[in-house]
């Protein structure tokens, strides 16, 4: 669980964020599929009436919302991956090395 010299970032926490983001993305996709399937099941069932329609409509809204979370989660995962890669390179950057010489 190392940090990065010159940056207040905990490598272990960054790795944990990567793992949690991947799990969250997977869970959102699974939840969206289940919600969509439930709405379709209700639509094809014998359950009728205003309440059934409202339940189905709510489920469809939830499925759409969950679907709209997929791309932002993918962007979030990419950002965390980029952060991890760039933090690992930070100490080798020439500007960082120059700053270390000026401000030891």
UniProtKB/Swiss-Prot annotation:
Keyword Secreted listed: yes
InterPro entries in alphabetical order: ESAT-6-like_sf, T7SS_ESAT-6-like
Disruption phenotype: Increased capacity to promote cytokine release by host dendritic cells. Does not modulate the apoptotic pathways of host cells.
GO cellular component, one term: extracellular region
Pfam families the UniProt entry points to: WXG100 (PF06013)
Principal subcellular localization: secreted
Subunit comment: Homodimer. When mixed with EsxA does not form heterodimers. Forms heterodimers with EsxD.
Similarity comment text for this entry: Belongs to the WXG100 family.
Protein name as it appears in the record: Type VII secretion system extracellular protein B
